């Protein structure tokens, strides 16, 4: 994934969904985290790049420090849906959210099985969010 594509898609998502995001009362945009090693290899987190552009268009803060990938997971494509979720629940940590942040928008680049969004959403709810809405730029198509 190229960084400029993330900027483009984040901006487009903001233009398309800004009104809905306002209606939902979203208080923070939170990108799905990548493991620090992956970030170093790539130089950036694509979900964070998308989230930054989206946040700019919507005038909502991007908050990337609370949700963290603390453990590297094995290749999830080889796992069953249950294994994926369990691996991700162990790999993701969320700091307690500020008390005034109750409605968040979780952003990722690709929605495959939903396990990543599910694990991150659970962690955000445990950390104090009352509502977690999700936005993904692309999804997997079954053949």
Tell me what each language-model feature is:
Residues 1-105, 115-143:
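Conserved PRPP/pyrophosphate-binding segment of the phosphoribosyltransferase/PRPP-pathway fold
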């Amino acid at each position: 994934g190229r960084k400029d594509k993330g900027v483009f898609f984040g901006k487009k998502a903001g233009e398309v969904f800004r009104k809905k995001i306002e209606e939902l009362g979203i208080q923070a945009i939170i990108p799905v985290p990548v493991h620090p090693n992956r970030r170093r290899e790539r130089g950036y987190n694509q979900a964070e790049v998308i989230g930054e552009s989206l946040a700019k268009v919507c005038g909502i803060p991007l908050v990337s420090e609370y949700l963290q990938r603390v453990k590297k997971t094995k290749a999830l494509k080889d796992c069953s849906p249950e294994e994926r979720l369990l691996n991700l629940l162990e790999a993701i940590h969320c700091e307690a959210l500020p008390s005034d942040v109750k409605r968040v928008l979780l952003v990722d680049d690709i929605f495959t099985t939903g396990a990543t969004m599910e694990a991150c959403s659970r962690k955000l709810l445990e950390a104090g969010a009352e509502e977690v809405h999700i936005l993904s730029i692309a999804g997997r198509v079954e053949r």
